[in-house]
């Protein structure tokens, strides 16, 4: 079955979540996130926010991230340390399987992802989730 999405229309349905933090409860996130289509073992997800996401990782596969509007800094924690990537509208990144990552978008971002499930989130403000969970 083919799924066709009008990305502009889908993003217009979302409201901008301002002041997002890693600890933002689901009630704050309501209306700023959508899962418009399934994809393989996960889904296509859309988000519209300004602030800082929770750290997350995907143990079963890579995540494809595309910035549709705005900008974000994508932080990845690797064996070499913390890496940062500045992403603006029209750019994408592939986050490797099981890699902790976080989005920081002080001025706001509209992002679409192809995300495998399950996703592990760490909803506390830490510099490195590995020190809390893996170490």
Briefly describe each language-model feature range.
Residues 48-50, 58-78, 114:
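Short, conserved beta-strand element in jelly-roll/cupin
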Residues 35-38, 54-59, 76-77, 84-86, ...:
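Short histidine-centered beta-strand/loop micro-motifs
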Residues 1-46, 131-135:
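A short, N-terminal "cap"/entry segment at the start of jelly-roll beta-barrel domains
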Residues 78-97:
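Short acidic-glycine-tyrosine-enriched beta hairpin
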């Amino acid at each position: 079955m083919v799924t066709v999405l009008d990305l502009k229309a889908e993003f217009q349905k979302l409201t901008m979540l301002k002041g997002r933090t890693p600890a933002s409860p689901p009630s704050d996130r309501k209306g700023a996130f959508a899962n418009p289509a399934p994809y393989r073992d996960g889904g296509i997800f859309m988000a519209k926010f300004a602030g800082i996401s929770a750290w997350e990782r995907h143990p079963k596969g890579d995540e494809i991230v595309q910035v549709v509007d705005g900008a974000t800094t994508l932080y990845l924690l690797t064996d070499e340390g913390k890496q940062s990537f500045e992403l603006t509208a029209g750019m994408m990144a592939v986050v490797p399987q099981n890699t902790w990552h976080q989005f920081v978008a002080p001025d706001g971002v509209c992002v679409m992802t192809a995300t495998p499930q399950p996703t592990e989130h760490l909803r506390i403000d830490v510099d490195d989730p590995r020190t809390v969970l893996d170490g």
